[in-house]
Amino acid sequence: MNINATLIGQAIWFALFVFFCMKFVWPPISRALDERKQKIAEGLSAADRAERDLELAQEKATANLKESKEKAAEIIDQANRRANQIVEEAKDAARAEGERLIAKAHSEIDQEVNQAREQLRKDVAVLALSGAEKVLGGEVNQDKHTQLLEQLAAEL
């Protein structure tokens, strides 16, 4: 191989070209590559953070949903217990009212029976005196009449 001036010139120009590229072209390209690399790393990091945040949000949502379901079940149970309590109170009140009405009716019946008996005693006494008066043919005096009425009432 012949080394001539052209080859030496080309080698010098190539060395100058490499130096020029290393000095002026390579730093901006390297900087652009580093920036791109950093942006990609930040994007991946942000994606990882977003994925973790999503998982945490899903866990919180699941926990909140579970808690809400438990509270709803508790509220429903409490409402059912209260409804049953109200029904029982209404039944007890109705029972007590019925018993009170029955007792009142019994009391009124007893009063009416006693009044009827008393009236019957008076009527029987009057009839007995009037019958006795007719049988005896004369009138019994008022004191004896009252005394006989009281005695008959006591006997009846």
Swiss-Prot record:
It is found in: Cell inner membrane. It comes from the Bacteria. Pfam families: ATP-synt_B (PF00430). Keywords: ATP synthesis, Cell inner membrane, Cell membrane, CF(0), Hydrogen ion transport, Ion transport, Membrane, Transmembrane, Transmembrane helix, Transport. NCBIfam families: ATP_synt_b (TIGR01144), PRK05759.1-2 (NF004411). F-type ATPases have 2 components, F(1) - the catalytic core - and F(0) - the membrane proton channel. F(1) has five subunits: alpha(3), beta(3), gamma(1), delta(1), epsilon(1). F(0) has three main subunits: a(1), b(2) and c(10-14). The alpha and beta chains form an alternating ring which encloses part of the gamma chain. F(1) is attached to F(0) by a central stalk formed by the gamma and epsilon chains, while a peripheral stalk is formed by the delta and b chains. Belongs to the ATPase B chain family. This is ATP synthase subunit b. It comes from Alcanivorax borkumensis (strain ATCC 700651 / DSM 11573 / NCIMB 13689 / SK2). The lineage of its organism: Bacteria, Pseudomonadati, Pseudomonadota, Gammaproteobacteria, Oceanospirillales.
